[in-house]
């Protein structure tokens, strides 16, 4: 199923059974690729259903999904047409382990630091309002990802 998804539009009308199957396939793909190439496993496995829900409700890339740190964006990459190249994750000239607008228009920022998503999303939202762009902006934050709060 994942090989047939070229954009988030392709998942909008899936049944619950198909969503469950897609979730399992995304998890298996992430586990297989991270097992070979390294990467952020737990943070990505933990947001599979959230990522599917975001892409079903919102219209990416017109609606901007901004990932805090962005190390949990692997399902997002798979749902935005990068499945065919996903095996190159974190390899030279391959898919980045973080969001990267040079890879896809659904990635708005290169990220890698915590707590930048809110300010990035706010800046993007203000810019859109000034341009009368009605696209939505969503910041996805993941707290307590293996770190103790300060």
Model-assigned labels for residue ranges:
Residues 32-41:
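Asp/Glu-centered strand-loop micro-motifs enriched in Gly/Pro and often flanked by an aromatic residue
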Residues 12, 36, 105-106:
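A short, mixed-charge helix-start or loop-turn motif at secondary-structure junctions
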